[in-house]
UniProtKB/Swiss-Prot annotation:
Glycans are attached at residue 34. The gene is cgbb. One of its GO terms (molecular function) is hormone activity. It comes from Hypophthalmichthys molitrix. This is Gonadotropin subunit beta-2. Keywords: Disulfide bond, Glycoprotein, Hormone, Secreted, Signal. GO terms for biological process: G protein-coupled receptor signaling pathway.
Amino acid sequence: MLAVRNNILLLLFCLVVLLVFAQSSFLPPCEPVNETVAVEKEGCPKCLVFQTTICSGHCLTKEPVYKSPFSTVYQHVCTYRDVRYETVRLPDCPPGVDPHITYPVALSCDCSLCTMDTSDCTIESLQPDYCMSQREDFPVY
């Protein structure tokens, strides 16, 4: 009876390892990727659209079958590990409005808890190149 139980446990372990390997081999890893983003500022009539590097990809997460009101589930997301900050100037801002926007550029990424300081932690966010005002594409040299 003990041998049967051990064989079942071994089989379950092998299935879990196989599923993790299969899942991670078909989904893109968490890494820096080039993306078109838009930045805008209240008071400036145009948003600026340009290419930068963001973090994107798959992180292994666990969702418990039994959800207890006494325990908290922490999901890991693909987010910034190391960043560099760059500044762009928005076009046509009126006098008295600072036309500069500073944004993070991903140098490396990591699967960790979502930090609202550097990431959009919402379930369904707007696309990164969404503009509420008139678009102006930043020239690519």
